[in-house]
Amino acid sequence: ICGSDIPRIYADGAHKMPVIPGHEFSGEVTEVGRKADERLLYKRVGVFPLIPCGRCAACRKGKYELCRDYSYLGSRRDGGFAEYAAVPAANVTVLPDSVTYEEAAMLEPMAVAVHAMRRVLPCREDRKERVAVCGLGSIGLLLVMFLKEAGYQDIYVIGNKDYQRECVKKAGVM
């Protein structure tokens, strides 16, 4: 369960109600649509929740994350808390046997962390510069792990929970 699912359920509601939340999920393909590749049937898949319109200028340039008329599993369409979810074939990736469903459910926050890294630190050659991560929720912790994996050694973290700091210590950053 993502922290943003909680207010969608108990406070603010989703973008469009009623809707079944859950945007970080994985599963098994049990049915395919007419245009989908039948080889997806019964495959284990990870799901990307953003469904771009495919028509706007951003989509035509392949910049789907900038689509203004997008749909989103778990807030604009039923998501992963449902027993079954209708997901476009373009929004799934087949999982290797070595990846669990639980790990695959982290694909969306991993993509956010990688995107942040690429936006803030594009093509940096010097891995010795200082980097700070503000916030140690799931995405912040993933960002710390990815920065360390990319060779950054001087990583500063700002978090307010003991268990988050313990995770960072286990990653060898503090």
Regions found by a protein language model. Name each.
Residues 10-57, 96-98:
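Glycine-rich beta-strand-centered segment in the early N-terminal region that forms part
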Residues 2-6, 51-69:
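Local cysteine-cluster metal-coordination motifs and their immediate loop/turn environment
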Residues 99-174:
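Mid-domain Rossmann-like dinucleotide-binding core that forms the NAD(H)/NADP(H) cofactor-binding site
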Residues 1, 24, 43-44, 58, ...:
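Residue-level marker of beta-strand positions
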Residues 55-58, 76-86:
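A structural motif shared across PLP-dependent enzymes of the aminotransferase-like
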